[in-house]
């Protein structure tokens, strides 16, 4: 029996022992070494050749990932680790570090219970380090820390023991400060990483060695010994004495939770159903015999197997040939295969019980974020996955040959299922389709995959920026009349209070129609007026619809229509047909016809939409543009060039500091001005500068630019160049 066959047999056995399972993600800022780390863990487990680890890119299975040298999708593998005489099943997900692919990180965090956060010893904590930590902690995922590239501090920067310790300590302090500020209230202290306890490891993924305090105690090795070995060129000996796989996976087993521990506190946060119900107790008690409850976190298309879905099983057992129900899309599917991932391979195990990360095929129509259950026991949906970033750049695509239009539409629908952070708008009449993504690289990868993987020739437009609409002022009360003039609604709008808006962006407040009184307390704690807080009907697009009327007959009967109209109006605002956000609408009065026939959808929907549009156009409407944080590191002599380039892009400097001969600069720049930035900054720094970016959010577009950009957007969309005034909607 080969080593691989023995491992598969052991995995099949350990799958049924939740206390011996660890579901973990590896996440980091781009180029901090997490895929090299993943490869070496796979090599240590015998899944790829040790000689190729770090070059094999065992977790980067797509051609474009290997060509670019970055991880674009999340990749999975299961392996076995022995710790203190017991064997453990480690289900591992490697995630992207590039800001454009943060959606994969968020979805991966829903599938795992623990995360190995990788930080480069030279760069320290970087923008995406904070973002991936935020994504993990928001999903109640416990972190441990691996400080990578320690050999560079010794070999390149020539740090001695004291300087080395100072640099490593500063990284740990910074990571713990982030954990303390971002972790759930009851986990802030418990989840901070601790060197003495062994939840921090140091090493070199590339050179394949690592050490933490437990390993130091076992081997009597010190940092001085490590410095000596590096200086003497004996790092090959280090990997024998301090094997990376052993140190890292032992840390994972000891400090990250098993599913039967994690699901007790995670399930109530990510599932809206009744915890005391049979399904709820199946998840809390980890019963493989109870009702099936799972969530699909990723969808990919394989040319042989069709749709391959990654699914975390929270309750029951996923079985081959069983019929399952897709709760979100209200459809049934028959499972063709069910099993586990081993890097680029899948192993069909026939069954996958609670607590594991599974793959399944046969689920046509499934998309990431879908809840699955048994067809004969339908459950409540899991909470939607909140993505930290949102689409900010759009391209228009058309089929080169008109006859390929139906195929293009089908491919685009598939793309949006595989990656929910991609937003697709399909216009079957004109043949033009819009794809919106997280950035230039995100869209380049998606369009290249359509051309290369789907074998479809397409024409791709220049990138277009995604704007949003809002208001700067407070409108008067506006009357909206139904077409038959028998129904009238009185509405005004103003900007939503900043604490509420920020809480919606951060995910601290949930969107949706308000069903419970408890939600009002959350609004009040953020400074909202008590009476208004109790009367919020709907939260949508980071905006609120508040009913402040009293004793209006028949209002409850048209409530759903009013909210439908409110949501529809915000999808396409009146200024430029872009999404409207950050608004607070007050319904202060209404007059309704006594006969239900005269207050149906054809009357109520246009009345409320017109009132909303007129109120927005009466409240100093504005456009919001997406802003990126840009971090540049370059030799001091290039600092002036960097500042000049950023200022030419309407950017502003936020901070800068000097580290030896290197300047580190923080800027904020409109994404509209970031095209071609990589090449320009290379020229400005003589090829010696590095930069990284992070989405900051949306800010008000300077007023002197607004009219021109509104005209451009409206013309591109086939609308009249000038927006209508409020009187157009009040007529």
Curated annotation (Swiss-Prot):
Where on the tree of life does the source sit, at the highest rank? Archaea
CDD domains per UniProt: aeEF2_snRNP_like_IV, EF2_II, EF2_snRNP_III, EFG_mtEFG_C
Q: Which residues carry this modification: Diphthamide?
A: 598
| PROSITE patterns, per database record | G_TR_1, G_TR_2
Where is the major localization of this protein? cytoplasm
GO CC aspect terms: cytosol; ribonucleoprotein complex
Record field: transmembrane: none
Instruction: Alphabetically list the UniProt keywords.
Output: Cytoplasm, Elongation factor, GTP-binding, Nucleotide-binding, Protein biosynthesis
* A GO term, aspect molecular function: GTP binding
All copies of domain tr-type G, residue ranges? 19-234
Report the locations given in the UniProt record: Cytoplasm
List of residues binding GTP: 28-35, 94-98, 148-151
Q: Which HAMAP family match?
A: EF_G_EF_2_A
Job of this protein:
Catalyzes the GTP-dependent ribosomal translocation step during translation elongation. During this step, the ribosome changes from the pre-translocational (PRE) to the post-translocational (POST) state as the newly formed A-site-bound peptidyl-tRNA and P-site-bound deacylated tRNA move to the P and E sites, respectively. Catalyzes the coordinated movement of the two tRNA molecules, the mRNA and conformational changes in the ribosome.
Q: Can you tell me which family this protein belongs to? A: Belongs to the TRAFAC class translation factor GTPase superfamily. Classic translation factor GTPase family. EF-G/EF-2 subfamily.
The record's annotation in PANTHER family points to: ELONGATION FACTOR-LIKE GTPASE 1, TRANSLATION ELONGATION FACTOR-RELATED
- NCBIfam families from the UniProt entry: aEF-2, small_GTP
Q: What is this protein called?
A: Elongation factor 2
In its UniProt entry, the species of origin is given as Methanobrevibacter ruminantium (strain ATCC 35063 / DSM 1093 / JCM 13430 / OCM 146 / M1) (Methanobacterium ruminantium)
Recite the lineage of the species.
Answer: Archaea, Methanobacteriati, Methanobacteriota, Methanomada group, Methanobacteria
- Per the record, the gene is fusA
């Amino acid at each position: 029996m080969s080593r691989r066959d023995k491992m598969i047999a052991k995995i099949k056995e350990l799958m049924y022992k939740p206390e011996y399972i660890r579901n973990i993600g590896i996440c980091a800022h781009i180029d901090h070494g997490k895929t090299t780390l993943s490869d070496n863990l796979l090599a240590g487990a015998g899944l790829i050749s040790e000689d190729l680890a770090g070059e094999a890119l065992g977790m980067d299975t797509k051609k474009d990932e290997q060509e670019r040298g970055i991880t674009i999708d999340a990749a999975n593998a299961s392996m076995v680790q022995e710790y203190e005489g017991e064997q453990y099943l480690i289900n591992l997900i490697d995630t992207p570090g590039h800001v454009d692919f943060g959606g994969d990180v968020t979805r991966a965090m829903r599938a795992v219970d623990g995360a190995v956060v990788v930080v480069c010893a030279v760069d320290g904590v970087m923008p995406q380090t904070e973002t991936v930590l935020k994504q993990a902690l928001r999903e109640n995922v416990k972190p441990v820390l691996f400080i990578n590239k320690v050999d560079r501090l010794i070999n390149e920067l020539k740090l001695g023991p004291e300087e080395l310790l100072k640099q490593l300590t500063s990284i740990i302090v910074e990571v713990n400060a982030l954990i303390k500020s971002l972790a759930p209230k009851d986990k802030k202290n418990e989840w901070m990483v601790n060197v003495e306890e062994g939840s921090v490891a140091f090493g070199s993924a590339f050179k394949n060695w690592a050490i933490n305090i437990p390993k130091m105690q076992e081997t009597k090795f010190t940092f001085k010994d490590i410095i000596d070995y590096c200086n003497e060129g004996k790092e090959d000996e280090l990997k024998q004495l301090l094997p990376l796989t052993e140190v890292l996976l032992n840390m994972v087993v000891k400090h990250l939770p098993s599913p039967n521990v994690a699901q007790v506190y995670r399930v109530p946060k990510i599932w809206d159903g009744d915890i005391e119900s049979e399904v709820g107790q199946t998840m809390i008690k980890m019963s493989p015999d109870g009702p099936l409850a799972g969530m699909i976190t990723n969808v990919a298309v394989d040319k042989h197997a069709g749709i391959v879905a990654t699914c975390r099983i929270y309750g029951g057992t996923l079985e081959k040939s069983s019929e399952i129900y897709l709760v979100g899309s209200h459809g049934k599917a028959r499972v063709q295969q069910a099993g586990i991932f081993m890097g680029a391979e899948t192993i069909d195990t026939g069954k996958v019980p609670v607590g594991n990360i599974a793959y399944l095929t046969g689920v046509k129509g499934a998309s990431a974020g879908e809840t699955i259950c048994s067809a004969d026991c339908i459950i409540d949906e899991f909470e939607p996955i909140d993505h930290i970033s949102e689409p900010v750049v759009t391209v228009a695509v058309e089929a080169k040959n008109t006859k390929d239009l139906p195929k293009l539409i089908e491919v685009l629908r598939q793309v949006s299922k595989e990656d929910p952070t991609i937003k697709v708008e399909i216009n079957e009449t004109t043949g033009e389709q819009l794809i919106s993504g997280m950035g230039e690289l995100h869209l380049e990868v998606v369009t290249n995959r359509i051309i290369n993987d789907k074998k479809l020739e397409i024409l791709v437009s220049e990138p277009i920026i995604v704007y949003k609409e809002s208001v700067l002022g407070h409108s008067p009360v506006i009357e909206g009349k139904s077409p038959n003039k028998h129904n009238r609604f009185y509405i005004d709008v103003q900007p939503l209070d900043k604490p509420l808006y920020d809480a919606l962006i951060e995910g601290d407040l949930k969107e949706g129609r308000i069903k419970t009184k408890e939600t009002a307390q959350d609004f009040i704690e953020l400074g909202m007026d008590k009476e208004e807080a109790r009367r919020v009907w709907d939260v949508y697009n980071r905006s609120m619809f508040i009913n402040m009327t009293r004793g209006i007959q028949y209002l409850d009967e048209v409530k759903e229509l009013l909210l439908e109209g409110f949501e529809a109006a915000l999808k396409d605002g009146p200024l430029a047909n872009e999404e409207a956000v950050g608004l607070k609408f007050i319904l202060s009065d209404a007059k309704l016809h006594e006969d239900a026939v005269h207050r149906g959808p054809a009357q109520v929907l246009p009345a409320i939409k017109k009132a909303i549009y007129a109120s927005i156009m009466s409240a100093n409407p504005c456009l919001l543009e997406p802003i990126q944080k840009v971090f540049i590191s370059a030799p001091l002599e290039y600092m002036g060039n960097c500042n000049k380039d950023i200022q030419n892009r309407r950017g502003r400097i936020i901070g800068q500091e000097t580290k030896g001969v290197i300047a580190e600069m923080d800027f904020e720049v409109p994404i509209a001005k970031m095209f071609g930035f990589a090449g320009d900054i290379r020229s400005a720094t003589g090829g010696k500068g590095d930069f990284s970016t992070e989405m900051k959010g949306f800010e008000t577009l300077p007023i002197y630019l607004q009219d021109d950009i509104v005209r451009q957007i409206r013309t591109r969309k086939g609308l009249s160049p000038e927006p209508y005034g409020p009187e157009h909607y009040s007529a």
